[in-house]
């Protein structure tokens, strides 16, 4: 039995994929301590593993806006993220420096995890919940945030100072700005398949593609499945971050009021059902729904294009209409369209007529469903949590044997 330190990134799309891997490692006898924000305590302790809390930095990093419309200086965001990583790493290191661990697992986008592994001089494994990124790919994604160059920002000097401090005092290994968001490991576990990964040939053996980590989730037992079990189901969700979308949700109510089947609309926690326009009889509107169970039944998924939601939709062979709002969603959306598993609507072009036209096109053209099925089969064949655990444990074994040789 090995002692494992896990450091997760706050967000459903980051925590959920890690759950299956933690569950699998625990079943192999590993003893896991999992650091995350308080919001995920119940989800983690349900696995019968130790939960420890670190400060939730998302208000500083993402801001208060959940529409995807807020423009922020990218260098300012870098600074906020580096400050958060410094604080998290300091907090965790003080708690674990006198404890005994055998290896560290962390979210690929949480630099603090890599820092802790380096400071403890332990093998490190990152869980990548987006596409695997190289420098070219990372620059493309960063371009979605950036207005002008980093050097033009009034926050650039602060960024340089923070990066230098983290390199000198925390072994952060920041050489270029994209290193702040891409904390690679001795192995990087990527939750997609090589069949869906852009530029897959550029990623070698240190990248293990396992497909999405699909695990049953607790809660929402009151969802009226009897209303959708024998229906044509259209599922609409904008995820958990960019879901303050009252105007969009009202557009959906209007566009889909004559849909021949049931429309399941997940609106998140920012908007109350009472704030929306009149809800048609063919709609089920909830703050949160059991997404996996809905996707098993859905004919079409209208999504923001978060990697986790997209992967889950395709895993269940559901064609997509993608309306990206921010971050890596633009890259994910482009790949969905490139492989033919769905269509993209740019948020600045969104209208009721375009939404209706796009939904009808994807529903009525069987090629989208066929491509979604093809990608879904590649995701299922990638190996999932079992392959992730196998790869981590084999790497740990090899490192141990090498150290003892």
From Swiss-Prot:
Keywords: Glycosyltransferase, Transferase. One of its GO terms (molecular function) is hexosyltransferase activity. Its EC number is 2.4.1.-. Pfam families: EryCIII-like_C. Transmembrane segments: none annotated. InterPro entries: EryCIII-like_C (IPR010610), UDP-glycosyltransferase (IPR050271), UDP_glucos_trans (IPR002213), UDPGT_MGT-like (IPR006326). Belongs to the UDP-glycosyltransferase family. PANTHER family: EG:EG0003.4 PROTEIN-RELATED, FI06409P-RELATED. This is Uncharacterized UDP-glucosyltransferase YojK. It comes from Bacillus subtilis (strain 168). The gene is yojK.
């Amino acid at each position: 039995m090995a002692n494992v330190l896990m450091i997760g990134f706050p967000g459903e799309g980051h925590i959920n994929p890690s759950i299956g891997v933690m569950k699998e490692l625990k079943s192999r006898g590993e003893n896991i301590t999992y650091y995350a924000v308080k919001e995920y305590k119940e989800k983690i302790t349900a696995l019968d593993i130790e939960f420890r809390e670190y400060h939730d930095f998302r208000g500083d990093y993402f801001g208060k806006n959940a529409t995807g419309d807020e423009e922020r200086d990218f260098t300012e965001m870098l600074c906020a993220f580096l400050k958060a990583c410094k604080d998290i790493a300091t907090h965790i290191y003080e708690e674990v420096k006198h404890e005994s661990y055998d290896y560290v697992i962390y979210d690929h986008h949480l630099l603090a995890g890599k820092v802790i592994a380096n400071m403890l001089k332990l093998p490190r494994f990152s869980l990548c919940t987006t596409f695997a990124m190289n420098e070219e790919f990372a620059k493309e994604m960063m371009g979605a945030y950036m207005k002008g160059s980093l050097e033009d920002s009034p926050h650039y000097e602060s960024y340089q100072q923070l990066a230098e401090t983290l390199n000198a005092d925390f072994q952060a290994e920041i050489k270029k700005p994209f290193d702040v968001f891409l904390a690679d490991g001795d192995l990087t576990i990527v939750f997609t398949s090589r069949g869906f990964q852009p530029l897959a040939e550029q990623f070698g053996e240190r990248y293990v593609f396992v497909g999405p980590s699909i695990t049953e989730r607790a809660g929402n037992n009151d969802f009226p499945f009897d209303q959708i079990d024998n229906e044509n189901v259209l599922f609409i969700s904008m995820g958990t971050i960019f879901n303050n979308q009252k105007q969009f949700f009202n557009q959906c109510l209007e566009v889909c009021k004559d849909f021949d089947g049931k429309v399941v609309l997940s609106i998140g926690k920012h908007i109350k059902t009472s704030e929306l326009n009149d809800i048609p009889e063919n709609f089920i509107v909830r703050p949160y729904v059991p997404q996996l169970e809905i996707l098993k039944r859905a004919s079409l998924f209208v999504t923001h294009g978060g990697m986790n939601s997209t992967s889950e939709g395709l895993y269940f062979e559901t064609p997509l209409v993608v309306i990206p709002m921010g971050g890596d969603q633009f890259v994910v959306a482009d790949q969905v369209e490139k492989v033919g598993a769905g269509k993209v609507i740019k948020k600045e072009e969104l209208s009721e007529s375009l939404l209706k036209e796009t939904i009808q096109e994807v529903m009525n053209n069987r090629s989208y469903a066929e491509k979604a099925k093809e990608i879904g089969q590649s995701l299922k064949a990638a190996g999932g949590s079992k392959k992730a655990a196998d790869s981590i444990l084999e790497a740990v074994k090899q490192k141990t044997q090498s150290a003892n040789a």
